Swiss-Prot record:
A GO molecular-function annotation: ATP binding
Cellular compartments per GO CC: cytoplasm
Protein name (database record): ATP phosphoribosyltransferase
Catalytic activity: 1-(5-phospho-beta-D-ribosyl)-ATP + diphosphate = 5-phospho-alpha-D-ribose 1-diphosphate + ATP
Length: 281
């Protein structure tokens, strides 16, 4: 099975890191090459531009691909979304000069919009009943209103900082995007694809979770249970030869500080907090 992965840019490193955390160690990931093997002899990576990955998956060059939702929609490829990988979050927005007269999508009517996403922009304008010329560019989209190439732009932003630095303001949100795992419709039920989905979901499920282990007197167990309403309830094991139990539980990371303090108060001891690499639910 081939997995198409972004070959560079802000999506490459998080994608490779996720694969590593999911148990697919990538051999020679830091090297500049088109392919990379993994610890699984049946799984190979194919490195490509994020914008090209939808076509690679559509045409069967890869069974699955890791790329942005914006790229898949722009490509028009009929792919199946399997997992939102929860990184690379951004918005595609309609923006215009902050000192100009455009303040709503309707104001763009009769004007022009520069973008690297002509398909998405065309559909957005149609949905908003706006007739405007689309100026297709391949970079430096923020520059176009300032050199009179376009009245507005449709472009990707994460925080809006770059837009503000270039004297632009957001008029409307076109779509939200994040990096996701996509599959060719005919490969969704492949066993390797299902294994990959399970592995990715286990990494995502472990985010923001911690594993707590502790000892507690048998007669304080009920009090301990009240403190830790964790994932599925705590696991309790007798400690041989002692009137003590070992308690294990998964809790939200944000609750650890308060929970540990309360556990000490009710008599727990030997409290150990560890990170969780993967959590299969």
């Amino acid at each position: 099975m081939r997995i198409a992965v972004p070959n560079k840019g802000r999506l490459h490193d998080p994608s490779v890191t996720l694969l590593e955390r999911a148990g697919l160690h990538v051999e020679g990931a830091a090297e500049r090459k088109l392919y990379a093997d993994t610890v699984d002899p049946d799984v190979r990576l194919l490195f490509a531009r994020a914008a090209d990955i939808p076509q690679y998956v559509r045409d069967g060059a890869a069974a699955v691909g890791i790329t942005g939702r914006d790229q898949v929609i722009e490509s028009g490829c009929d792919l199946i979304e399997l997992v939102d990988l929860e990184f690379g979050r951004c918005q595609l927005v309609l923006a215009a000069p902050e000192d100009g007269a455009l303040s709503s999508p309707a104001d763009v009517a009769g004007g022009s919009v520069a973008t690297e996403f002509p398909r998405v922009t065309r559909q957005y304008l149609k949905d908003n009943a706006v007739d405007a010329e689309i100026v297709e560019v391949t970079g430096a989209t923020e520059l176009t209103p300032h050199v009179e190439m376009a009245d507005a732009i449709v472009d990707i932003t994460s925080t809006g900082t770059t837009l503000r630095m270039n004297g632009l303001t957001v008029i409307d949100e076109v779509l939200e995007s994040s990096v996701r795992l996509y599959a060719h419709p005919e490969r969704v039920d492949d066993s390797k694809v299902e294994q990959l989905v399970t592995a990715f979901n286990s990494v995502l499920a472990a985010e923001g979770k911690r594993y707590l282990m502790m000892n507690a007197p048998q007669d304080r167990l009920d009090a301990v249970r009240e403190v830790i309403p964790g994932l599925g309830g705590p696991t309790v094991m007798d400690v041989a030869g002692e009137d003590t139990v070992a308690v294990h539980v998964v809790v939200d990371e944000r609750d650890v500080f308060e929970i540990v303090s309360k556990l000490k108060t009710v008599g727990a001891s030997g409290i150990l907090v560890t990170e969780i690499e993967r959590l299969v639910e």
